[in-house]
């Protein structure tokens, strides 16, 4: 198989220099969750598109990695929360290997946050409260889709949705038992700020012996 000629696409020439800000130990919060809150609020205030979008990486029982974009739906001192179908590929991965990595990329701010940690399901009460806050179409979609399973064509999905709309017409939509939330409880959080000459700032928090340890990593 021949490779695409890089001279046509100039992929090797695609680069930018980062010059906006620095990230110094003396300026960050000792608590990485509070530091994340500060950066997240700045991303929201900058009106970035979907600042809560994050890459979620998981690994299957046979060591096959996979990654996808999901939306952060909450965070606190216990961790970072997202919701999905428990029977999806990521759900099956997490049932067998309950560890994950998250990545936030805020290009306009030249910032990245990496998170690694153990994953647990959130409580039924938390999941119920969030499901009931979702738009009605999203609630129906959670029933209509057998996420990650092969489907014949789009019409099948549309027909399922139409049938569900009729079934639950003028009544509340219950939460599917196969749908709910996960919390990634971090043991590592790294903050990355782009700098000139590829000498980026990387500050990494590691949780050890009941406390967070802050270290600078080489770029």
Curated annotation (Swiss-Prot):
Give the record's keywords alphabetically. Flavoprotein, FMN, Oxidoreductase, Pyridoxine biosynthesis
E.C. code: 1.4.3.5
Broad EC category = oxidoreductase
Q: In which pathway does it act?
A: Cofactor metabolism; pyridoxal 5'-phosphate salvage; pyridoxal 5'-phosphate from pyridoxamine 5'-phosphate: step 1/1; Cofactor metabolism; pyridoxal 5'-phosphate salvage; pyridoxal 5'-phosphate from pyridoxine 5'-phosphate: step 1/1
Chain positions recorded as substrate binding sites: 15-18, 73, 130, 134, 138, 198-200
How this chain assembles, per its entry, is: Homodimer.
Q: Which cofactor does it need?
A: FMN
UniProt organism field:
Acaryochloris marina (strain MBIC 11017)
Q: Name one Pfam family in it.
A: PNP_phzG_C
Extract the InterPro entries matched here.
Pyridox_Oxase, Pyridox_Oxase_CS, Pyridox_Oxase_N, Pyridoxamine_oxidase_dimer_C, Split_barrel_FMN-bd
- Give the reactions, separated by semicolons, that this protein catalyses: pyridoxamine 5'-phosphate + O2 + H2O = pyridoxal 5'-phosphate + H2O2 + NH4(+); pyridoxine 5'-phosphate + O2 = pyridoxal 5'-phosphate + H2O2
GO annotation (BP), single? pyridoxine biosynthetic process
Specify the protein name: Pyridoxine/pyridoxamine 5'-phosphate oxidase
The entry's FMN-binding residues are 68-73, 83-84, 89-90, 112, 147-148, 192, 202
Q: Which GO terms describe its molecular function?
A: FMN binding; pyridoxamine phosphate oxidase activity
The record's comment on cofactor binding reads: Binds 1 FMN per subunit.
Q: Does the keyword Oxidoreductase apply?
A: yes
Gene3D superfamilies from the entry? Electron Transport, Fmn-binding Protein, Chain A (2.30.110.10)
- Where does the source fall among the domains of life? Bacteria
Family to which the UniProt record says this protein belongs = Belongs to the pyridoxamine 5'-phosphate oxidase family.
Function comment: Catalyzes the oxidation of either pyridoxine 5'-phosphate (PNP) or pyridoxamine 5'-phosphate (PMP) into pyridoxal 5'-phosphate (PLP).
């Amino acid at each position: 198989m021949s490779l695409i000629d890089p001279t046509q696409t100039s992929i090797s020439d695609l680069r930018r220099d980062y010059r906006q800000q620095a990230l110094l130990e003396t300026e960050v919060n000792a608590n990485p969750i509070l530091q994340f809150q500060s950066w997240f609020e700045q991303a929201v205030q900058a009106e970035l598109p979907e600042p809560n979008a994050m890459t979620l990486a998981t690994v299957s029982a046979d060591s096959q990695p996979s990654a996808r974009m999901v939306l952060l739906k909450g965070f606190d001192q216990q961790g970072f929360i997202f919701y999905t179908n428990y029977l999806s590929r990521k759900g099956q991965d997490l049932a067998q290997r309950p560890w994950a990595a998250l990545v936030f990329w805020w290009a306009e701010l030249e910032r990245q946050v990496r998170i690694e940690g153990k994953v647990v399901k959130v409580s039924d009460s938390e999941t119920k409260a969030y499901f009931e806050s979702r738009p009605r179409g999203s609630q129906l979609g959670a029933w209509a889709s057998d996420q990650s399973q092969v489907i014949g064509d789009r019409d099948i999905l549309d027909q399922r949705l139409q049938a569900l709309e009729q079934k639950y017409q003028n009544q509340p939509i219950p939460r599917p038992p196969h749908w709910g939330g996960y919390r990634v409880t971090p043991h590592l959080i790294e903050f990355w700020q782009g700098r000139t000459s590829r000498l980026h700032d990387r500050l990494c928090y590691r949780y050890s012996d009941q406390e967070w340890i802050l270290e600078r990593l080489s770029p």
